[in-house]
Amino acid sequence: MKQYLDLLRHVREHGTYKEDRTGTGTYAVFGYQMRYDLSQGFPMLTTKKLHLRSIIHELLWFLSGDTNIRYLKENGVSIWDGWATPEGELGPVYGEQWRSWKTADGGVIDQITEVLKEIKRNPDSRRLVVSAWNPAVLPDPSISPDANAAAGKQALPPCHCLFQFYVADGKLSCQLYQRSGDIFLGVPFNIASYALLTLMMAQVCDLQPGDFVHTLGDAHLYSNHLEQADTQLARTPGPLPTMTLNPAVKDLFAFTFDDFTVSNYNPDAHIKAPVAI
């Protein structure tokens, strides 16, 4: 994916060194946008192998409204383990904000369901927005992620914090605003995850997939990922794979792992890099 490699190269060449919460240090730029035409293939990196199983299960977990990592662990996904309480709780993170945003009067808003209804009812709406950024439940930075979760706050503030859908010419597009992007490890997952969400939403709304637009705020490369980034930049991207969804599924919340099939995915070898916690 040239778009992603261009981002990696841009930050490698122009990033400003900054200290960060984890103490690792980053090279960062502020404000960067990529666009992927989903009719041209599924945007999953070919210059290193991605763990698609984790991407799919995490998205299904978000959409279920769950905030405990039990489902992920049962399906061999460990990407959230480092922030959860011993009981597996993460506090009111993505799933709760997407599906059960708490209101001041004691009610809840299912943002995903409301947006689905609005796409079908009024596809020209400019309000097809889902937000995970809820200041009332942001974590206290002076205590650990698991302590925040135990106190009813988010273990981590949402990195991919707001997305918007757009319908034109029978196609559904999605734009994600990501306030903070770990370019080497996190961003490739985010691209594939939101591209997949767009395919799913398009199918259940009887639309064709359009573009996935990815807007990054603080786009950063951790200082202990520089060698890995250079390794990836030396590789040549191959053709994008194809993602096929079970056409019988017409309910967004009825998708299961077995409803997704990726074909023609022939990536280069995985590149290992440490996670900054």
UniProtKB/Swiss-Prot annotation:
The protein's matches in PANTHER family, at most eight in alphabetical order, are given as: THYMIDYLATE SYNTHASE, THYMIDYLATE SYNTHASE 1
Protein name according to UniProt:
Thymidylate synthase
Q: Where does (6R)-5,10-methylene-5,6,7,8-tetrahydrofolate bind?
A: H51, D182, A276
Sorted alphabetically, the keyword list is: Cytoplasm, Methyltransferase, Nucleotide biosynthesis, Transferase
Tell me, how does this one assemble?
Homodimer.
Binding residues for dUMP, per the UniProt record? Answer: R21, R126, R127, R179, S180, G181, D182, N190, H220, L221, Y222
Pathway involvement of the protein, from the record: Pyrimidine metabolism; dTTP biosynthesis
**Catalytic activity, as annotated:** dUMP + (6R)-5,10-methylene-5,6,7,8-tetrahydrofolate = 7,8-dihydrofolate + dTMP
CDD domains, per database record: TS_Pyrimidine_HMase
Q: Where in the cell is it found?
A: Cytoplasm
Show the Gene3D superfamilies listed in the entry. Answer: Thymidylate synthase/dCMP hydroxymethylase domain
Into which family does the record put it? Belongs to the thymidylate synthase family. Bacterial-type ThyA subfamily.
Entry annotation: catalytic residues: C159 (nucleophile)
Please explain the role this protein plays, according to its UniProt record. Answer: Catalyzes the reductive methylation of 2'-deoxyuridine-5'-monophosphate (dUMP) to 2'-deoxythymidine-5'-monophosphate (dTMP) while utilizing 5,10-methylenetetrahydrofolate (mTHF) as the methyl donor and reductant in the reaction, yielding dihydrofolate (DHF) as a by-product. This enzymatic reaction provides an intracellular de novo source of dTMP, an essential precursor for DNA biosynthesis.
This protein's source sits in the domain of life called Bacteria
